[in-house]
Amino acid sequence: MARIAGVNIPTNKRVEIALTYIHGIGPTTAKKIVTKLGIAPERRVQDLSDNEVLQIREAIDADYTVEGDLRRQVAMNIKRLMDLACYRGLRHRKGLPVRGQRTHTNARTRKGKAKPIAGKKK
């Protein structure tokens, strides 16, 4: 197994697909990396030489924020919004949808399981 950016990449998959296992690298970014380095996209990870794996590792380290650094950056951005007490920060703090979705009905994923309220008594 090749280890890139602290992630064990599956060896039996194509390079483009395997790179998407790294948090912060999607299909488009993986395609850019592979074409920039001149690696055939249909090649499997197990067929890559150590030098090619090293090139991929260096390209990712140089050009992209991935894994722990990216997670930390996103968490810090959310924390900054919460500290500013702006509208988006307050929504994050309350655990409600941030981007203007309705909450009268729906938003169950963000709000959590529905809390039962006393129904109409007969």
From Swiss-Prot:
PANTHER family: 30S RIBOSOMAL PROTEIN S13/40S RIBOSOMAL PROTEIN S18, SMALL RIBOSOMAL SUBUNIT PROTEIN US13M
Gene field: rpsM
GO cellular component, one term: small ribosomal subunit
GO molecular function, one term: structural constituent of ribosome
Subunit structure: Part of the 30S ribosomal subunit. Forms a loose heterodimer with protein S19. Forms two bridges to the 50S subunit in the 70S ribosome.
The protein's name in its UniProt record: Small ribosomal subunit protein uS13
Coiled coil: none
Organism: Zymomonas mobilis subsp. mobilis (strain ATCC 31821 / ZM4 / CP4)
Biological classification of the source: Bacteria, Pseudomonadati, Pseudomonadota, Alphaproteobacteria, Sphingomonadales
HAMAP family registered for this protein in UniProt: Ribosomal_uS13 (MF_01315)
